[in-house]
Structure formats: structure tokens, C-alpha cells
Amino acid sequence: MKVAVLGGGIAGVAAAFELARQGVRPSVYFEHSGSSGLYGGALDFEVWDRVTALAEVDEDLARFAEALGAWQLGSVALRVATLEGNVRPARGAARGLLDLERCAGKRVAVVDLERDDWDAPLLAASFAASSWARQTHTHFYEARVRALQNGFERRISGYDFAALHDTPERSQALLSAVQVSGVTPDAWLFGPWLGIERALADELSQALRVPVGETTSGLGGAAGARFERARDRLLERDADVHRARVTQLARVGSGYRVTALEREPGEFSAVVLATGGVAAGGVALERSFERRGGTGFSLSFDAPVALELNREVVEGVSSLSSVDFVARGLGTLLEVGIAAGADAAVRDNPGLFAAGDALAGRPRMALEAARSGLNAAQRALDYVRRST
């Protein structure tokens, strides 16, 4: 029983985990993480300001989150501070983010250090002005901490600054800087700088005996890097990994052949497509070279798979077939994807299953991606078992 997973983002990792848990060691193909490596650390099933009820975290998703080791999911919603100055609810969060629900009605110190991309007084004022802070009487204020050791640390990327604190010397220096600041809040809120490999937020919490955590990360920041490390650890245990770009997926007999650059082709009974949407490059914009040619979408690799937009199949691009972005809006970029049914089965392709942002018309959210990856893996296993 051979099953392949195409994609190394959240959906692909969830699918690989579920396959391994049920006794099938998958082959996982991916070159990059896609949009999963860009996420900020807040975990949702749908856009957070449209949520009307608390979504349930089922047993399968909770099991995957525990195995991944990078997320915190609970029976109630969390509340996080964003890098942009918002206080918002989240169904879960990456480990290291400060859960503000634990700090309701208390004094939260926003670390003030001289980085060019960080304005602690402005952020503290924005957090304090949020409806949640006013309702819970939570006080945010800036607190100067002299944690920079070199001038270039003012302007290096958030990822690089976080990585500096993986060393014992820098993590100890940061703790010392906080201790000598003369400030004794009920919680400390940092930017997304508390290490990549080490759980520095937990270490500081234990040393200071108050909650310590971060805001969300920017694109390509610490949260995405931590996910990638956790993914690599899980896949090393559960899957055969091929770090290569897939160029073709072709039907062969009752199964499929996967062709990737600088790899021998592999044949599989079923394949989970977790190749991402437009943001990840799994779905590409395509331009016709005809004189009056239009613009449309295609998969980034050759496969017998139809793309769908608003429940309509997206045909090849030509002067007669084109996506009108003026009429449809840029939201089209978040809607287009592989045409599949509720059971994740790719239309007209027995043995193919889609997950995550690769699916048409599904929320582009981390927990939705994980849930759909688990579902696609389960459906793939059901298909293979029926076929054999």
C-alpha cells in the first residue's frame, strides 16, 4: 500500500501524520513550505472577525497538534496580540504567543527596545484601546528593556533577531535585561523574537514567575520558522521525504506516477494533493500570448486535474476564456483551487484527494488546512483499502 503526499505545508504534514498513524508510511514530496511558512502564529478555522461560534477541536486534530508540538489548542478560545497592534480572539496559537486571556484585568508590560520595526509605546496604546482591554480592565504599558548588543540588531529581520536568542548566552542576557529593568508587571509581552529552536518564552516564564510570550509574527518570521522545524521533526519520524519540485502527476494503470526534479519517478495507489493555492505557488496565474488573450489559472505542475472558481470549472486561458478580475475582485485569488467533493476526492480522478489551500472555495486558515489534511488522508486510506 503506497500513498504519496504532495506538499510540505500544514495540510500535507497533517495528511502524512494521519497516514503514518494508521500504519502507512507515506512518501512526501515538497520543495518549500508555501504559505504555511508565512503564517503569524494565530490559529483559526475561518477569518477571525467573522467567527460567530466557537469551533470544536475534534480528537484527530488535537492528536495532530500534540504530535506536531508547535501549537496550543484548548477547549476555549485564546486571545492574542498582533504585530500590527490588534487584540483578537484565536481558536489556538503557536507555542510562544502570549495568551492574553490569562492576563485579563492585569498589568501587561510591552517590551520597549530600539528595533526599527517595533514601537512599544504605540503598540501598548493600541492594545489598551481595544474593546477587550477596556471590558476586562487590562492595562498595557511600555517597559524599557536594554536587550540589544549590537547596532545592526536594530534592523535585521525578525527571524534573524529571534534566532540570536537560541544561544544560551543571549537567552541569559535577555533574562538579565528584564530582571534589571526595574519593572514588575503581571505579564511580559515581547515581539516575535524569543528563539526559533528553543522554547524561550517558557523558560522566561519559569524564571520570572509570570506569563511571558510574544505577539504574532510578520510574514516569514519566527512562527513560520518554528512550524518548519516542527514539521521536519515529525516527517523525519513518520514519512519518506523527497525535497524536490514535482513536475508531473500522471495516471498509470489503477494508480499514479509522481515525477519530481532529480528524483526517480514513484508510483502510488493514491495521492493527497496539498500543494497550496495562489499564495504558495501551487496554483499559478497564466497569461495567454494571443493578441487579445486573457488571464487565468493553472496548476504549477502537469496533472489531469480541473481547477474550480465559484463552482465553475476554470478552462484553459484564451481570448474567449479568461478570468475578469475587475468583475470578480481580487478575492478570486483566495477562492480558486482544485475541484473536489466534500470527501476530498478530486473530481473524475479516483485515488486523488485534495487538502488545504489547494481546495477550491475553502477558508485559507491554518486549522482548516490541518483538518482537511487529516480528512484527505483518511479518505485516501479508505479508497486504497477498498481497492485492494
Predicted regions and their residues:
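Dinucleotide-binding Rossmann-like beta1-alpha1 core, especially the glycine-rich loop
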Residues: A42-R115, P121-A133
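Conserved beta-strand-loop-beta-strand element in the redox core of flavoprotein oxidoreductases
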Residues: D232, T247-G266, V271
